Amino acid sequence: MEAVHFGAGNIGRGFIGETLAANGFKINFVDVNETIINALNQRGEYTITLAAPGEKKIHVDNVDGLNNAKDPEAVVKAIAQADLVTTAIGPKILPIIAPLIAQGLQARDAANNHQALDVIACENMIGGSQSLKKSVYEHLDDAGKTFADTYVGFPNAAVDRIVPQQKHDDPLAVSVEDFKEWVVDESQMKNKDLKLKTVDYVPDLEPYIERKLFSVNTGHATTAYTGKYLGYTTIGDAIKDPKVFNQAKGALAETRSLLLSEFKNFDEKDLENYQNRVLQRFQNPYISDDISRVARTPIRKLGYDERFIRPIRELKERGLNYSVLMDTVGMMFHYVEPNDAEAVKLQAMLKDQPLVDVIKEVTGLKDAGLIDEVEASVKSKDR
């Protein structure tokens, strides 16, 4: 079996590539990074190191690289005969690869390849595959859309694996945590006969995406912003401080109450165990993560539907507690990082505009009560 995977970065090689290889796929990695593509073609293999006791090595072979900037025709040809297409390139890049995927689907149609194909976006976003589908369909004519409707699925997925910041002399070397989770919405699949080992297939993905967003993303960001406020530079050092650990644990207790209220299929004890495992992952001494990486783009992370404001809104609607989340939001407005364009912009806005105006603009909140609470939280963190 052959897979085409867009994105030969650390997540692509260290998570998606590992899973595809373990399921017997030959993997065609697609990327514009010439160094990585050349190395894949020269060696046809690479090694993953688990960031865990023993630092186990995982060997991945039967791989090659395709440069979509220099040889798009080769990518189209690969999609035309692929058994599976996956991505791990970042949400903003999905629309950029959409024309190439559309050409690949047209080539499948021209070759009368009627084998069902799923295109799975493994991105840190909600509805990634369906978003990619929308972009792909913009580049298909009516006949192409009919072919895709019949034979091509775009099942949404939730993926979770921490890949720490790292530098290697070998461009293909990659280190990842031993925990991994990949969940696919089975209801959106076209090729239901192709199920990957270690991947979970579920009838409704939403609870799993929300669980990950409000546990891993909210918890990691809480650790980062609290740690930064208290003077730390790495997640590992920050989480050792009981103040930071308890802030993260408290934030997750609040999001847990929201998840249990929203989704009846979650068991409280199971969810608590899941979130405790999340906190243990942040404590992993083999993962050195800079706070500046985890806390980057604070304006985006303060957004209306993002990891803090959304649970705060929904907890308030349900009459549930959100005091730790609100306290963390106060610290986010004090985040200073000269190398982060959004952090610089946020501090400039706070200097030039009234605080309440910045809160409204950044969070999108209309609820006057919540705006007042955010304002009070920010002011309580003034030094």
Swiss-Prot record:
This is Mannitol-1-phosphate 5-dehydrogenase. It holds the Pfam family Mannitol_dh. The lineage of its organism: Bacteria, Bacillati, Bacillota, Bacilli, Lactobacillales. Belongs to the mannitol dehydrogenase family. Gene3D superfamilies: N-(1-d-carboxylethyl)-l-norvaline Dehydrogenase, domain 2 (1.10.1040.10), NAD(P)-binding Rossmann-like Domain (3.40.50.720). InterPro entries: 6-PGluconate_DH-like_C_sf (IPR008927), 6PGD_dom2 (IPR013328), Mannitol_1_phos_5_DH (IPR023028), Mannitol_DH (IPR000669), Mannitol_DH_C (IPR013118), Mannitol_DH_CS (IPR023027), Mannitol_DH_N (IPR013131), NAD(P)-bd_dom_sf (IPR036291). The keyword Ubl conjugation does not apply. One of its GO terms (biological process) is mannitol catabolic process. One of its GO terms (cellular component) is cytosol. PANTHER family: ALTRONATE OXIDOREDUCTASE-RELATED, MANNITOL-1-PHOSPHATE 5-DEHYDROGENASE. It catalyses: D-mannitol 1-phosphate + NAD(+) = beta-D-fructose 6-phosphate + NADH + H(+). The keyword Oxidoreductase applies.
